Amino acid sequence: MRHRRSGQRRLSVRAILSHTLAISLGVLVTVGGLQARPSLAQAAPVEIAQATPANTAAPNSNPDSFVAAAVRQIGPAVVRIDTERTVTRRAAPMFDDPFFREFFGSDFFGNVNPPARQEVQRGQGSGFVVDGNGLIMTNAHVVANADQVRVTLRDGREFTGRVRGADSVTDLALVEVDTKGERLPTARIGNSSNVEVGDWAIAIGNPLGLDNTVTLGIVSSLGRRSSAVGIPDKRLDFIQTDAVINPGNSGGPLVNSRGEVIGINTAIRQAPGAGIGFAIPVNTAKQIETQLLKNGKVSHSYLGVQLLSLTPQMARDNNRDPNSTVRLPEVQGVLIMGVQRNAPAATAGLRRGDVVIATDGQAVTTADEFQRRVEASQVGQSLNLSVIRDGNRQQIAVRTGELQAG
C-alpha cells in the first residue's frame, strides 16, 4: 500500500530495495472485459464470429481417454457469459486534454460543451453452474459494471442473468438466472486441498469467442501468491497450470482427470513463446460463495502496512551500508516499509522500520505468512504483535479493520 514520503529515517536503498523485485511480465485477466483494472491488461472486445458448439461425445472417441470422460462429466455445466454496458463519452475528448488547452489557450475553446455520445462495450467470459436452480460461478471482472448479462449453455439455451454478488478482492462472483423451473446441469466440485503438483489439469471455456474449448496440461505449482503473479490488488493463492488459458476463459473451470472442478481460471502471465495460467482454488471459491449468498458481499481484514520479508543477511547488508541511516535487527521477520495513514496499523502505533517477529505468540518469518494470518482473522479481531523497534522488543495490539474494495 502506498505511504506518504516524509522526513522519517530512510532505509538503505542498496541493501533493502535491491531485494524487492518488480514483476515486469504482463498479467492478463482472461476475458474480453468491460473495465480495465490499473494493474491488469485486458483483451479487446470480442468481435469475431462464434464457433458452432462442438459435439462432446463422438461415437467413435477413444473409450480409454480420461480427458473425453472428464469433458463429458463437466461439459454440460460450463457456460458462456456475454456482457454489455453503456458508457457515455464526449465526441471530442481533446476539449479536456491539458495539452490542447495549453497549446491553443483556454480562450480558444471558450465555453464549448461538445455533445456526448453513448457506446456499448461488450465482453465475454466463462462460468459453470454450481446449483441447478440457476446459480453460476465466474470471475468478478467478467461481470464488473455490466448493465446486461447473458448466459448461454452448451445445449444452446440462453438466460438473462443478474449478478447475485461479487468480491473484487478475490475476483469471484455469482450470477443468477431464472430457469423457469428447469434444472440446469451442475458441475461436480472437487477438493483443491487434495491437488498435487503434476496432477492432470483440464481447462474448459470459451477463449477468444470459441465455444466449448478444451485444453490439457498439468498442475505446475500450488500456492502462488497473487503478489508473485503480478496482481497485487488481489488476495489469493493460485493454482498454476500449463493448460492453455486465453482471453474468454476467465471464470471457467479447471478440472481434474475425473471432471471435478479444482479451480476457476482467472489469469495468465505472458512470456515469449508460452503462457502460464492461474486458477483460484475451488475451496477458496466455496468459502466466498457461502458469504456472497448470505451477505451479498465478503468482508476482508486488513492492517494498512507495506511489508518486506527480512532475513538476517539482508539486515547485515543494510547495517554495513554507510548510506543506511537505520540499523535493523539481524533476525528473520517482517519489516514494515510503510504505514497507511489512518489505517488500523497507524492507530495501533506501528511505524515504518518496525520488524514483526511473531503474531499471537507464533513466529512469523515472511511477509506472505504475515499477510495470510491477517486475512484469516475476523474484521475487528485484535492481533498481538511481537515487534522489534530500535533494538528493543515490545508487544503491540492491533485491531484489524475492514478492507474497502476499490
From Swiss-Prot:
Enzyme class label: hydrolase
Annotated keywords: Hydrolase, Protease, Serine protease
Xref: Pfam families: PDZ_2, Trypsin_2
Residue ranges annotated for the PDZ domain, each copy included: 289-391
Active site as annotated: 141 (charge relay system), 171 (charge relay system), 250 (charge relay system)
GO biological process: proteolysis
Enzyme Commission number(s) of this protein: 3.4.21.-
Molecular function, one GO term: serine-type endopeptidase activity
InterPro entries xrefs: HhoA_HhoB_HtrA-like, PDZ, PDZ_sf, Peptidase_S1_PA, Peptidase_S1_PA_chymotrypsin, Peptidase_S1C
Protein family per UniProt: Belongs to the peptidase S1C family.
Stated name of the protein: Uncharacterized serine protease syc0938_d
Species whose genome carries this gene: Synechococcus sp. (strain ATCC 27144 / PCC 6301 / SAUG 1402/1)
